[in-house]
Structures are given as structure tokens and as C-alpha cells.
């Protein structure tokens, strides 16, 4: 599935990361022999006290939360996931030291790839110091099998770099004495996406910096291997990716910018494997292609209001003049994804009530569309990649929410039958008494902004509850609402969790993003303010018990709100925060400046854009006043968010607070806010992929929140009430 992910991913200030639960599985598996990773922690200092000293005040509580989090992850270590890859005769899976496979008829497993052997090639990266070599830890990102299971290709990533390495393994018959065991036959560096067209032909894209612009073809023959160039994109704001259709008969070359799409097709059933164009790019046209029989099923924003609808075109005449509408969703319903399952198109959609549903459209009788209701708490849908040998007419997926662990479901589109993996529709462990409330806040311009609130007691009983508010609002991307054990822990300790779906994101369709792009960016800040006011008006928590959390571009509305209304929250945690919008967009030499102009604007070439950015940029609007306490976590090698901007923001913020307290010693700014900068090594934009390091980072955030909000540490399960520390306002 993941049809729209390529349209959203591009090279934005966001990434798709390995599931944290998956990281835990890698830790507890019996074959764990990960290469050791030594990570140095670097802390900057200010004029009075270093951030390292600031961090010391959280250490004891951090150790406590690390133990609690590890126990929570252990509890969920056996929940279902879709990480295994099913071939015709084998199931492939990742365990600590490599990739393994198991014959579906036997229980014995065989190693296909040893990650330790891959790590012996650091010389390609110029690393010659033994201590530095020990910092390399390979994690498997993606696995692809060739059609007849002759070859396996996998991309691997290290903590120190965004670049991926693709390893091609020739597979033999399992445990056969007559054939060679699985062994590496080819290695490619800087590979981002890759798909097999045949057993001997692999198409792939390469990542240069943060941009994919070239497609190559690798031919594996008995004599020698050959690499040829297939496609090169010349537009600097276009990101290129290769994707295989569900039925494996069409390989697409997707060329997407923020506002345009262009798709080339390769028919894998033909011998020449030459790409041909579907529809030339044109401004504000977005589309994605799937395959059904000899037709193309296209998800395109040609519907009312330039929203997504489903159209059809013959494979022989794929251009826009041949597009015929199959299905248009009703007003207020936003299509989030599409899949083709035999003779049906399955759409993931969000209703006007902000609930996720499945819409099934018969491709033989398009007017016979029907809607499949899911549990009301559903906030995320994770489809399973179809098995190679699976010809069933079934769509398998997992549903979850930040506090509900994944539950497996099977949909049989032809019969309209929906089955859960458990009898009662819950996950194997008890989901608990967790309430999901969907709210709407009125912005000053009359726009209704959705809020998803998770809580364990009725809303009227949340007055004294601490509140953690999540926000993003950029690139048309929805807030990440997959299951997270940390959120479950907070909820069980009496917290309320709010997810504010502000404009700039994609929760209410493409227009939701368009309203808060470039000159409309202030609307996202106003939406966040409206959400907080609405929650407080309902009696949910209070400013002194409220914390905001965001990552990457989500730091922009949070930072802007802190400048305008710092008394609306007591604490903030930011991860890999994008805070210097003006400085970044003024510098075309930075990796994402040119690509991001359609999102943030061009302050160099357009005076209006410069004025707009200057009005909300978190760094350039810092003023002497009483700010909330802020924990900033940044990564020294992060190329998406320049570290210089985070350092400059931290320094100026501390100076502004110091100036304010000096000017007004009797001000209400007591206790003084703590501005803590935690700089970690590595290039992972959204944090370490090492489980232990991830636990330390998350435990520090929890320790920071409890300390700055003046909360007692969590009590045992029978004493969950959170009490304010005496003497702290």
C-alpha cells in the first residue's frame, strides 16, 4: 500500500523510522549480537551553568523511567507486526545479527545475511580507526525478494549517516548440500528505493545528499553484472522513487515534488523493460498509479476542491485525456491511501468526524462502493505487504492508536467480510479502559480544528490532570498516531494526551495543507492556540500542567506559540527541531532549501514571503519574557535540520530569559525556566535506532516533563494519582 507515502516523503524534514517495538524485538531475540555502538554525548554550555549540569538534575528520575519503559516494552514485545517477508517457500525475518529465513514446512532457520560481515567494509566510508569502526551498527531498513526467490536485496543503515547500503544476496535451496549457501553477490551504496523486475534485474534509486534524482538498472548474469542508467530528474525540487505494484506486474518510477507528480511505467511482463510516461507533470496535479488487469487505477487530485478521487485509464493510453472517474468520496471525506486487491480498490479514508474507515470500490461495478467501519479508537492503519505466493482475495492490516497496541484484521472485499485477529477485536493483551474523544476547536477565522484526546477518566475529571499536547502541521503529513508504549505509560499514570491536527498537515485532505503553506503558515500557529484554549475551556488540565511536544518541522508552530503566548504551557520537548526558518530558507546551499520553497516560501526572491516568515519564525521572534522550560534534543550529524540553528535558538532564548529576569526581578517568572540542550552524535533525524539509546532519550524526556511540571514520580499501579509537589506553582 503506502501509495501516498512517496508523495509525502520526498526529502522533507521528516523520515520514516524503524518501529520502536521492532527495535525492542531485536534486543530480546536470542541471536542478539549487535555490533557495539559507543555514542559520545556533547552538551553545550551557557554563561551560568552548562547544559550537562542541567541534565544532571534529571538523572535519577531518568534512570527510574528507563526501567519503567523497558518493562513496558517487554510487555508488548510479542504484539503482531508485518516485518516478516513471505516468499514462495520461505519466510524471511530480521534477528539481531542478520537476516534469516525459515522453510514454511520446517522449523529450522538459516542465516541469509550476517550483518557482521557487512560491517567489514567500512573502508568504503574512509573509516580507519578501530574505535570509530565500533560505532558502526547496521540496521535492516527494507527487504525485497526477486519474483522466483532467486535473489534477496536489502538496504542497511548505520547510525552515523543518512546513506543506505544495498546488499544483494543470491539464495540457494535451504540447507541443500548440492547448491551454494546464500551469499552476497553485489553491494551498492547510497541506495534509497529498489524493486525487482525479474529474478536478474533490479531497479533502484540513489540518494545524493537528501535528494533522489537518478534511477539505475542492475543486471545480474552468470558471467558478470552490469549497471545502466535508466532515468535522471533535472528539477531540483523533485524526489524520485521506484515502487512495484501489488500484483508485481508494473514497476513505477514516481517523480514527485511538493505540488507535482510524474509517473513512468515499466511493464515487468515484457522483455525490454523500457519505461514509458503516464502523464507529464503539471502544476498542482498529484497522482499515483496502481495496476489492475490491463488497466491503470489512478489516485489523483482531480476531484472537487482538488482532492483525491479514483480514476481509470487503459495501460495502452495512460495520459490524462483517457482518465475516467471511478469513485469520488463525499464532501469532507479525505482519501489517505489506496490499494488494489484483485477486483476491488480499497481506500483508507478519514471521515468528516475524523474517524478512519475503509472504502471498498468494485472495479467491475464501481457504483457498488461500500464503507467498512473500524473501531472508533483507530488512529493508524498499517497494511501488510502481500505474500509472493498469496493469491487470496484478502486485505490484511493492523490498526492501532498511540495507546492501543496493534490489532490484526483481514478484509475480504468481495464478501464485505471483516475479521479481527482476536475474538473480541482487541489485541492479545488487555487494551484497558482508554477513552478516545474527538473534539473540534474554533479558530478565530471560523475553521474547525480536529483534536484527538486520550484519557482514562471522564473529561470533567481532567482538571488536575497533566496534559501532553502533540502537534506537527507541515508537508501535508498527518500526525504520527501509531502505538507508542511511552504514551500508554503516561496515560496509565493519569495524563491526558491531546493530538492537535492543525492546518499544514493532511488530516482533512489536500486543502488542509494548502491553507497553511507559505503565506498561510500563521494559520497553523493560530490553530494550535485555538486547540489549547478549547481544551482548557472544557476543563482539561491547565497551563501550569500542560506540556507541548513536537519533532522536526512541528517545532515551528510550537516555537511560534511560545513567543506569542508563553503562558499557555509550562514545558516543551522538541526533537530535531526546525527553528530557524528564515535563516535556512535564505541559504540555498543547505540540503532542503530549494525543495522546501513550496512549503515555506522564498524569502530571498519574494518580499511577501520574507515578511511572512519573519512574522512567525521561532528564532527571529524571541523576546525578553518568561518562557516555558524547554528540552531540545538535536543530532550533530543531522542534515535535515542544521545544528547551527538549534544552537543559535538556545543561546538567544537563554539570553532573553536572563534579560527579562534581570529587568523584572519580582516577576512571575519563578521558578526560572530551564532551557536544556541535549546534543547527541549521529545523523538519525528522529533519534537513535539503538534500543538502549532510544530508551535513555525517552526516559530523559519523561524525567524532564515530571520535573518541570512539578509532578511526583509515578506511583505503583494501585496508586496512579499524580500529586503536585508542594511549593511549586
Short names for language-model regions:
Residues 169, 205, 254, 266, ...:
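Generic beta-strand/beta-sheet core signal
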Residues 276-288, 323-336, 369-385, 422-432:
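Conserved blade-ending motifs and adjacent loop-strand segments that build the rim/top face
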Residues 80-81, 88-97, 296-297, 391-423:
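Structured, non-catalytic alpha/beta "coupling" segments that mediate domain-domain communication
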Residues 502-729:
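Active-site-proximal cap/loop segments of hydrolase catalytic domains
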Residues 211, 237, 259-261, 272, ...:
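Flexible loop/turn segments at secondary-structure boundaries
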Residues 129-134, 423-547, 551, 556-557, ...:
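Cap/lid segment of the alpha/beta-hydrolase catalytic domain
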Residues 2-361, 480, 484, 681-684, ...:
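Beta-propeller folds
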